[in-house]
Swiss-Prot record:
This is General receptor for phosphoinositides 1-associated scaffold protein. Residues 180-257 are annotated as: Interaction with PSCD3. The modification Phosphotyrosine is found at residue 236. SMART domains: PDZ. SUPFAM superfamilies: PDZ domain-like. The modification Omega-N-methylarginine is found at residue 269. The lineage of its organism: Eukaryota, Metazoa, Chordata, Craniata, Vertebrata. It comes from Rattus norvegicus. GO terms for molecular function: identical protein binding; PDZ domain binding; small GTPase binding. Expressed in brain. Plays a role in intracellular trafficking and contributes to the macromolecular organization of group 1 metabotropic glutamate receptors (mGluRs) at synapses. Keywords: Cell membrane, Cytoplasm, Membrane, Methylation, Phosphoprotein, Postsynaptic cell membrane, Synapse.
Amino acid sequence: MTLRRLRKLQQKEEATAAPDLAGRAPDSEAARAAPTPSGPPAAAAPPGAPGDELYAALEDYHPAELYRALAVSGGTLPRRKGSGFRWKNFTQSPEQQRKVLTLEKGDNQTFGFEIQTYGLHHREEQRVEMVTFVCRVHESSPAQLAGLTPGDTIASVNGLNVEGIRHREIVDIIKASGNVLRLETLYGTSIRKAELEARLQYLKQTLYEKWGEYRSLMVQEQRLVHGLVVKDPSIYDTLESVRSCLYGAGLLPGSLPFGPLLAAPGGARGGSRRAKGDTDDAVYHTCFFGGAEPQALPPPPPPARAPGPGSAETPASVLCPAPRATLSRSASVRCAGPGGGGGGGAPGALWTEAREQALCGAGLRKTKYRSFRRRLLKFIPGLNRSLEEEESQL
């Protein structure tokens, strides 16, 4: 609240107090007519500090009006040390509502209430608070007549503080009190807190179990669909996140080697996937076809003969004819790199290439990426492992 607003409020007070001063005018005139003793004039009373006058004027107003004036003006009150003015708290927190109840029962009668003890976990303070509260109050019982309600936390029994005491000891103290029981209760939300805490623990346990099932399903999916076998199960979480990122970026399907494999079922199933590593790595061809029956591989070519002066080179189409129908099986062929041993000469190399064409069809082509595994490792920060560890054993 600004000083301008306070001055306006003081002017309103003076306007309302004007009629009262006019009614008291005769008394004041009589007082003026009375003789005054001779002598030096008395010193005038020192004016109070401006802050004291403001606080004295504010104490006469209702707190609601002060709150409204502060909200409208957007200002703050000047602070004064040692001031007796305090904001009144009309909405006391339920956790601070303590009450003392006295329960009286007959000789063959019970108090008519039930208690429970829960442990509330405080993660910030790393401790467990044991709270004993009233969970049920019977109708027309001494507890109900005394004003005991469900949800009241028991703070003391017969003047003895029971905070932190075990449940069995509290029950023994209540039973040993006789026909008169004096309880100090603290109303709070202990029941609701305990229920929510138990529910939270149950949901966490369920989430942990479901997460384990999800990880096992991810392992099976990666093994069946992509042929990946990794010892570290955390790699599957990374693969899933990378795949979702690639889907969101629009790179799949089609741009990566396994892009068409993850396409919709309505897409073309026939095709070939090829991933080529470095010069020291082997080359793998995995083909997926759709059809009724598998086709037998063409027979190996006859041994090479020295070409004569009038003979010509045997074309690859004669050695390996074109494939007939589509296959329904998936196969993986490992082809030795150039100079990789295993001999056979030019006809052996031609037969190997023709055999790859017979398996993978005419759609076999090399992707523009050197190694998909090397590209995938760029998306996985901190994963510095050799390529042999993630290599598929097909």
